[in-house]
């Protein structure tokens, strides 16, 4: 029964979107990519240098910033309708960055290079303005709460939105009672629920972190195996980055990743950013007269909440993410569980992107029953099974309370995603999405084609440790970007962006009024005002 009901809603929606009048709608999905990567020395060690001034201000440059550490770059593309253009934009950012990196490299995988002692990992610095200091103190709080080592893991964030005009069309066809905005938000939450159910598939297909540098765990207990003196791994792992790795945030344990409507999501976040957590209270916000964390609550700010996918809305100046969501609803989703593929210069390619579009469209348009505690638990354990042992022959997952082999379920899911790939091809012309889906089917049939298997195979073939393999890949990608510099006018655009961002930061700092403590106080108050 269930299968046919699934298809009924999906078939209706496919038919509606396949009508000639609506077909071009799907060309208006938007795609943005954020790619994080560590700067490393020629020897593959963490670069201890400040963020290169030639890349502009990490505070105000919209395309090149820093994530947690001064050494952890983040490249941000604009949101564009064609992912080929998004990737072309990401490529240009890489080429510009390489023109300013001197003898440093961008580290190719998600898991970090051999790291120095915790105290020697530099926290990203954003200058003396109040907002710059706020970002710095927030990162000091993360160090205090979770340690710096964890914060050096890099990933790819894939931002995706469906066309705004799609929602009124579906809403009318389905007789939804409520506002357009409510329908749009509840549809995105439905996408997120399905993503929770099926994201294990992305980890099998794109997980690329089966091994890591042995020093990463800092001598703590773990369940990993020793591959060589410098490398820990699990033989069937797909993504140790997304596994628990022995780090559990007890403070965040009460926050469920499963929610059935936007209000319950914003409520739980509002509570978390306003509820003190005893171990943090014990430390306090100051030590020796210096700020060490923004507050002593479960979360300092919303972004501290760790999840595989986030509902998002572009914020206005001074507005908090949660306020934007409550005021204007969900605008797009941010997929946060994608590993950087160390074989690809940008860590992601067009094939992956085209498949992600079909996958996310399937999550959005398919029936999405509400999540119960039970189905939420199954989704979490399926995800954790796949990241730790996704390539284990005969691995079983839980589907609707019944065991099912990963390969069988994966093949069935791809079969169901195929009509969405076909619809995207129909809309865009060509067969790129169906071809991208075929490439994933090949990985399901043969696990040696997965990036995680290929990483282990490459290390074995070259008799390399994780760090040696990663440095070799980093050098190859550096050569790829450096061998073909940007055209002069493109280079000039980035130079101008860097210059104007530095001027913007200087202006912010010059015109700063008011004391930092007061600034933090009013920032806190902005969330408390909506928490009651």
From Swiss-Prot:
The entry's keywords: ATP-binding, Glutathione biosynthesis, Ligase, Nucleotide-binding
One biological process term in Gene Ontology: glutathione biosynthetic process
A GO-annotated cellular component: cytosol
Statement: the UniProt record of this protein carries the keyword ATP-binding: yes
Reactions listed under catalytic activity: L-cysteine + L-glutamate + ATP = gamma-L-glutamyl-L-cysteine + ADP + phosphate + H(+)
Entry's Gene Ontology molecular function annotations: ATP binding; glutamate-cysteine ligase activity; metal ion binding
Keyword Ligase: yes
Enzyme class: ligase
EC code(s) of this entry: 6.3.2.2
Pathway per the UniProt entry: Sulfur metabolism; glutathione biosynthesis; glutathione from L-cysteine and L-glutamate: step 1/2
Family, per entry: Belongs to the glutamate--cysteine ligase type 1 family. Type 1 subfamily.
Stored PANTHER family: GLUTAMATE--CYSTEINE LIGASE
Identification of the protein by name: Glutamate--cysteine ligase
Lineage of the species this protein comes from: Bacteria, Pseudomonadati, Pseudomonadota, Gammaproteobacteria, Pseudomonadales
Record gene name: gshA
